Amino acid sequence: MALQTSPSTIARLLGVRSYADMARTGDLHIIDQLIHERSLTLSRHPLWPLMRPVLFRIFRYREAVRMADAIAGLPGREAMQYLSSLLSLDLTLSGAENLPAQGSFILAPNHPTGIADGIAVFDALKHHRPDMSIFANRDALRVAPGFRDLIIPVEWRAGEKSHAKSRDTLAMTARAFGDGRAVVLFPSGRIAYWNEGTLTERPWQSSAVALARRYEVPIVPAHITARNSGLFYFLAKHSTELRDMTVFHELLNKKKFGFTITFGKPIPHSRLVGEPADVTAALQDHTVQRLRLDPQAVFESASPIG
């Protein structure tokens, strides 16, 4: 009889339960669950029980578990402040006078590193506009349900999207603008990648432009200068799953890390003229390229303003 080499067989031989089995029964810690969802192919590999301890040590698994346990029961702003204190980012701000003192606006930053970008923006806004709401991955609520008082959740998992979740996102969005809050939205929705020696922002979605038009609020562009580790960019070239498994490593390795945020001049919704895709491309270029070179740059509309 041939020896089977399925993941469950290897796991039984090693005296441990299959990672996939634990995920199905809900026996995984939330950090394990999030890692499993980002490594579906790897976690089914026959050698996964052997690879897992090594990878988890590299990716700072135990630190991530302690962090998640610490914020699990906290209200959103307290949880974010915990993360802020944990990282103690070395933050340099420019153009903070461009942040409206009251009333809704959309802060539209580039997205160089991941979760740490959100912490940096929180640090930048918490004294200027503590009434902020931040669009973020719905997974944040799975780690700390209290984030609902700070985060507008967006579901990224195709198989988990639903009309109910979409309605929830839309309702929380309307509430944030109705309350006159500062709304943070990373238009790329994905982390920048390394391309021929340059950190490259992924194409922006038109959400920020659409929301600014709908709610008639200005957009404040924000250029973030920061980067991830060489390990992240190396793995990104070879395995998207290994890259995605570094999500907590690339947060926790930012302790005392330098971030620079340049806030550009507010762009009135009336200047967002043209096809949404064209306006969005112009906004991305303005934020990622022009603000980096000239903090006083004025947004140039994609179409002539009548």
Question: PLM features: what roles do these ranges have?
Answer:
Residues 2, 6-7, 11-14, 166-306:
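Non-catalytic C-terminal accessory region of glycerolipid acyltransferases
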Residues 44-59, 70, 74, 143-144, ...:
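Alpha-helical membrane-targeting segments
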Residues 82-88, 111, 159-164, 197-198:
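Short, flexible loop segments at the rims of nucleotide/cofactor-binding pockets, characterized by
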Residues 105, 130-133, 181-183, 220:
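Generic beta-strand structural signal
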